[in-house]
Design a protein with these regions (language model features):
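Active-site bordering "gate/hinge" segments
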Residues: 1-180
Length: 180
């Protein structure tokens, strides 16, 4: 979602917001690289687990990132979301009704920006999603601004999910021994 934010800002000429978004995306990539060894392509998940145990600093750094990101997200809204030019360009543009979203199969943030409650994590929870509390972000306007806001609010929901899980990462084997 930080990449989405950054690229949208760049496309709209809001270069300060673009640089802020990429700066903060780098913080996320630094944490991932420390554990997975890759910045953009992690190749970390495997059949039976993951390639390696998490880095000893992982939990600490994730908590620091969450603490850092909350006020930064408010700053994003101050410098971009509230910008009259951004609002004029995004509001009322590219409207997708709920009916069309369902008909076209536009799931994810696009569907939810049109008022379609289609978050698979809520409808058919998998992994740990059934054990965490989070809000399915919905807007009804169906325009570009609603799609933007869904993604921005989903960043906050992602932080809530991570906060609920970060201290509960199980210890022990990180990859099951399996026969080929």
């Amino acid at each position: 979602h930080l990449l989405f934010f950054s690229c949208l800002c760049m496309d709209m000429g809001a270069l300060t917001a673009f640089f802020y978004g990429f700066r903060d995306r780098e913080k996320v990539l630094d944490i991932l690289e420390q554990t997975t060894g890759g910045r953009l392509i992690q190749a970390y998940n495997t059949i039976g687990g993951v390639q390696a145990d998490i880095h000893p600093e992982f939990v600490k750094k994730v908590k620091e990132l969450i603490k850092y990101l909350r006020p930064v997200l408010k700053e994003y809204h101050e410098i971009f979301t509230g910008n009259v030019i951004a609002q004029q360009r995004l509001k009322g543009t590219g409207v997708l009704t709920r009916e069309d979203a369902v008909s076209f199969g536009a799931t994810g943030g696009t569907g939810r920006a049109s008022g379609w409650a289609c978050d698979v994590r809520k409808r058919h929870p998998y992994a740990m999603y059934g054990k965490v509390d989070f809000r399915e972000v919905l807007f009804t306007e169906g325009d570009c601004f609603a799609r933007y806001m869904v993604r921005m609010e989903e960043i906050l929901e992602s932080l809530r999910i991570i906060e609920q899980l970060i201290d509960n990462i199980p210890e022990g084997e990180y990859q099951l021994k399996m026969k080929p």
